[in-house]
Amino acid sequence: MNAKEILWRLEQKKSQHREKVRFANSDMDITSSLFYEEISHLSFDAGRLGLNFKNKKFGVRTDIHLLGGYDYGIYKQDWHAGFQTGNKWSRKFSYSLPYKQCDHIGDARTNWELNRHFQFALLAKNFYATSDLKYYRELQALFDSWRRENPFLKGISWTSVMEVAIRAINWMYTLAFLSQSKNVDKDFKIRLSVGIRNMIGYVSQHYSRFSSANNHLLVEATAIGLAGLAFHCEKWKTLGISILTEELLKQNYTDGVNKELSLHYQMFGMEAYALMIHSMQTCNCNVPEIWLQMLEKMTEYVGCSSWRGNVAMEFGDDDEGKILDLQGGEINHLQYIMQLCSLVLKTPYQYIFQHPVNETVCWLFTDEEIGDMRRMEPLPISDACCFKEGGNTFLRDGQDRVLIGIDHAALGFGSIAAHGHADALSFQMMMDGKMLFADPGTYIYHCDLPFRNLFRKTEMHNTSVSYTHLRAHE
């Protein structure tokens, strides 16, 4: 940790202390009043997020997929649920709330999925598309329940800045759909706008930096940038774009492989850039050329690492993370990301548009744009793809039945290598989309630490192991 990072962390502690003095002894509703005076004049413009309000290809699911397969219907208003146990997260001040290795409660990552509020945007979309008040009433009930039970900086939903950022993004899309709908209570829209501005104001003061700056920072910057576009706030727009530009080559190798060396986290970051690019294009805002060049390389890498655009061969962690979901239920995340990036780049990749188009994509692009992708000749995938700098090679059998992936990469990004595994020279193999030799992945993040560590160890991967060497370093 260098001197600049130490100074930043000290400044963050000072800021947190000021917030504790202001908010710890009160239950401030995030939607009741603005906490930051400089954002009081901002107004929301629903047309600047790039939604296709003419879309007629939609479903009306109201459930979201929860990490671990938990039943959303049981938990949909259980905002403080521990999930892995019957216990609840405390509603104490978030800076004083420990959430890692709390095995007596559960894995915070599971709870965060519920509090990202994909269901808010989903219900608002359903109401806009059908005018059926049952979706509006359910959205109101969830919104009122959440704001009452989750005052600002109280409880598990406020323990991660990135989680606040994802929630703010989903509130923006929620407000966009409601702004185009009839019979919407004006106070509801005002509360959403106030809540979004408060959350973005908070994120803009606390976004990740230095050794903490990984995929979290990309999502936080995207939230700030999208809010800058949607609220006509030049300060937020400029900040978001500048962070995303600076981080692009810090967090990715020049051949398109993300330095976290986790395919899913690469796609998570790609979604952030793609959503931001799409909104910038909608607003006639100049997109840095390096963004498009790198996103093209990253999309090519993901295409090479998948079987017929349907099944991903994943090395490293996979927590099923996403930023926006207007379809609901359990989605094919690979198809969604590849379709989204193909349309942003105006370049179809092999197999991608042979699959059903994800509904989120239908709400972001017109039928004509999607049709153009279907008619264009897709980019082929080579039978041998080697990403020397990023450290992965993929081999195919010529008939696209067999896919082999070989990991000859570093172990992860930065000093903590948070989402990479000790998987040097490991390989995977699938045939007809079925895994024959698989990476173990990991199923847990913030609890049961011995198992978290076990599934990241070398001996859990398809590679050679020197047990004498391992024992010497344990």
Which residues does each PLM region occupy?
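Conserved small/polar residues in nucleotide/adenosyl-binding loops
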Residues: 468-474
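Carbohydrate-active enzyme catalytic cores, enriched for enzymes
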Residues: 261-437
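Covalent nucleotidyltransferase core used to form phosphodiester bonds in nucleic acids
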Residues: 413-418, 443-458
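Extreme N-terminal leader/anchor segments
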Residues: 1-70
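Aromatic-lined, polymer-binding surfaces characteristic
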Residues: 101, 105-295, 306
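Low-complexity, Ser/Thr/Pro/Gly-enriched N-terminal "stalk/linker" regions
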Residues: 59-97
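Structured loops at beta-to-helix junctions and adjacent beta-edge loops in soluble globular domains
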Residues: 70, 82-85, 100, 206, ...
